[in-house]
Regions:
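Glycine/alanine-rich phosphate-binding loops at beta-alpha junctions
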Residues: 234
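Short acidic, glycine/proline-enriched helix-loop-strand junctions
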Residues: 249-258, 303-311
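Active-site T/S-Asp motif of two-component receiver
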Residues: 231
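Acidic/glycine-rich phosphate/pyrophosphate-binding loops and surrounding catalytic core
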Residues: 2-224, 228, 240-245, 254, ...
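Glycine-centered loop/turn positions within well-structured domains
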Residues: 237
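Short, charged, intrinsically disordered terminal tails
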Residues: 243, 286-319
Length: 319
């Protein structure tokens, strides 16, 4: 089982999902079957059972989405592992869940459910791996993802980050005001002007973060009232020098005027170079962009397994 950090350490991440998420699952099914289901017609409505097999190693994440796909199709899912468990390590094709229902409904939901589960699990696996690497390097603070998510699939990807023990970062543009270089340039290059406008419009409840290219810009942003400063595309040594200087000036811990985030090109190969006590947040899109999926397969059990030989080996076409 993956070590519990972040949201999973305090409760069930599924309880964070908004009421609209079930509608999103329904839209996935509509996208996949906008008209006649010819394959479903062939197999009919007879009762059937299918096994969900984990064919590669990883952290299981996305259980609510998988379950909801089949719930909307009048099927039931019984899990033999828990969300957050590591699967596929000791057993190549580990039986992780059983799905029961009308055979055409099993096949109707198969690809949609597998896509969500595989993607979400891949992100949770990568998040857990990167977090473990940072903990081994002595980093004790927050690892976060980014907003560089797949349009229409953000909820699943952010959920995977949570299950993997990471902070999902801001959910959307309304969750926090992040002033990037383009925002500053659009305000005649003035960080104080941009921060003042953000504070005036968003009010006290919304934090303001400023992307900074230098220690000087970070000082200006904090002085202007930024709640978070992002040191963007710094070198590892540059981050350590700048973050210490900023903390020395603006305070640490509960006395800090602002949090310090580090981002820009961080991945498993270099993130350990950035570890120091004065960084509050390390964020990386490598947690969720270009991440290898965890490979799952759903295999329907033949009505008479003995007559048809053993159940399929779990290999299937990608379509």
């Amino acid at each position: 089982m993956a070590s519990k950090e972040g949201a999973p350490a305090h409760g069930n991440p599924a309880h964070l999902l908004p009421p609209s998420w079930r509608k999103t699952v329904g839209l996935w099914l509509e996208e996949d079957t906008p008209s006649f289901d010819y394959g479903g017609f062939v197999v009919g409505d007879g009762p059937a059972e299918a096994r969900l097999l984990a064919k590669s190693a990883g952290i299981v994440a996305g259980v609510p989405f998988f379950d909801e796909v089949f719930k909307q199709l009048d099927c039931t899912v019984e899990w033999h592992v828990k969300e957050g468990d590591e699967v596929g390590v000791q057993e190549k094709k580990q039986h992780v869940a059983t799905v029961k229902g009308p055979v055409r409904c099993l096949l109707l939901g198969e690809r949609v459910a597998l896509n969500a589960l595989a993607r979400c699990s891949g992100i949770a696996t990568k998040a857990h791996a990167l977090l473990s690497l940072l903990r081994q390097a002595g980093y004790k603070n927050t690892l976060a993802g980014t907003r560089k998510t797949t349009p229409g699939f953000r909820l699943v990807e952010k959920y995977g980050m949570l299950v993997g023990g990471c902070d999902p970062h801001r959910q959307d543009l309304s969750a926090m005001t992040m002033l990037k270089d383009n925002h500053i340039w659009a305000c005649s290059g003035s960080i104080p002007t941009a921060v003042a406008a953000a504070k005036a419009s968003a009010g006290f409840a919304v934090k303001v973060e400023v992307e900074c290219q230098s220690e000087e810009e970070a000082n200006t942003a904090i002085e202007a009232g930024a709640d978070v400063v992002m040191l963007d595309n710094f070198t590892g040594d540059g981050v350590k020098v700048a973050s210490k200087s900023l903390k020395d000036r603006w305070g640490r811990g509960t006395n800090a005027r602002a949090l310090i985030e580090v981002s820009g090109g961080l991945n498993e190969d270099n993130v350990s170079d950035y570890v120091c006590d004065d960084i509050d947040i390390i964020s990386s899109s490598s947690i969720h962009q270009g991440v290898k999926h965890v490979d799952f397969s759903l295999k329907v059990i033949p009505k008479d397994a003995n007559a048809h030989g053993k159940m399929g080996d779990g290999e299937s076409a990608d379509t």
